[in-house]
Amino acid sequence: MSRVKKLHQWKERLRDRARTVSFGRFLWRRFLDDRLFQAAASLAYTTVFALVPLAIVVFGVLSAFPAFNEWKDALTDFIFTNFVPGAARSVQNYLNRSLEDLGKFTVAGMVALVASLLITLHSIEQTFNSIWRVAAARPKVTRFLIYWTVLTLGTMLAAASMAMAAYVFALPLFRTTEGQWLAEFAWRLAPMAVEFICIVLIYRVVPQHVVRLRHALPGALLAVILMEIVKWGFGVYLGNFQTYQRIYGALSALPILLLWIYLSWVSVLLGASLASSMAAFRYQPEAMRLPTGFEIYGLLRLLGRFRQARIHGEGLDEDRILALEPMLTDTLMQELLCELKRMRLLRRDERGQWLLARDLDLVPLAELYENCQLRVPIEDRPLPCRDDAYGQAAAAALEQLRQPLRSVLAQPVGDLYTHLPGDPP
């Protein structure tokens, strides 16, 4: 192997190592910024209060279809057997009693139950939007339709899957010794498969953001692994330490259930943070990084791209924006898009593409400066992509803005106070 090839290989390895280290730092910063443990604690409390209304909706949907009515108990047993610690299994009896007493609920009680469910679903959506750095939530009607669709179709698909599995495993193929072993293996694998599929769907549907499958799959895999570790840890603790029963007595199921829900949310949110980080991370060489304080340069370039797209009658999606402007990070791009949307300078169409909503010839720079609150840098710095048409236009605008500031800011601070009352002549 020639020295040139060896040198090229080492350069590739160093670049990959730098990319890996950069992604690790980026992922850690996202974990800290997302404050996932606090978010999981909040969701755990709201989820506990939403268990009864959620069960009412789920089993109410099944009751509306006689074909699925016989699978209600089987679905409940499957959920509590595979996804709830044994010490909290008594919660199943409480839910069953609540469902039996459903006819005794008053209108006010039903309104309170539905409100608690909607609050929980709204909190979940807000948390996922925060993880994916989405500032604008869905319209209320759209949000309600998505909630209802997920709950109803998800319930029907779960019951249909159990019915189909029961039919398949009843075939003569699974009556043999090998077939019984295969069926038993499939039933053991089913909880993890259900977890994985549900989490992937949550990542794809809940955020007001286009989450690609290649990002959702690793995040869901991490979440499932963490949840299986939590299950194993719970099994070890509950099987060897019974102190919690002596402390809480008959109420021991409640703290166990609350802790279980909290750790489950931690697992799901950590997986979501990984998925969003994989989508947002972009390895930028030093020469392609936007210097701190020069965000206005990126903003002017971005508006130039939208102006050009409008001339051609096109919109820009977020992937296209990042491809055209490699100096923008995903976080900065989301912030700029959110601010421009708030100014009603941009709008989003039904395909998720961003479009100019106003003529830039009628938008003064002062409006951008006041609303976006970006500083005008005084000193000149090497800027990425400065030599193309957009870079030249943005750099020229910055130079015009900074020229009058330089002379004003060059004067000493003490000169501002030369004419105060009481100063010596």
Curated annotation (Swiss-Prot):
Magnesium keyword on record:
no
Q: Where in the cell is it found?
A: Cell inner membrane
Major location (coarse): membrane
Pfam family membership, one: Virul_fac_BrkB
Membrane topology value:
Multi-pass membrane protein
Record-annotated membrane-spanning stretches: 48-68, 105-125, 154-174, 182-202, 219-239, 250-270
Which keywords accompany this UniProt record? Cell inner membrane, Cell membrane, Membrane, Transmembrane, Transmembrane helix
Q: Which PANTHER family match?
A: INNER MEMBRANE PROTEIN YHJD, UPF0761 MEMBRANE PROTEIN YIHY
Regarding protein family, the annotation reads: Belongs to the UPF0761 family.
What is one GO cellular-component annotation here? plasma membrane
Domain of life of the organism encoding this protein: Bacteria
Descriptive protein name: UPF0761 membrane protein XOO3615
Among HAMAP family, the record links this protein to:
UPF0761 (MF_00672)
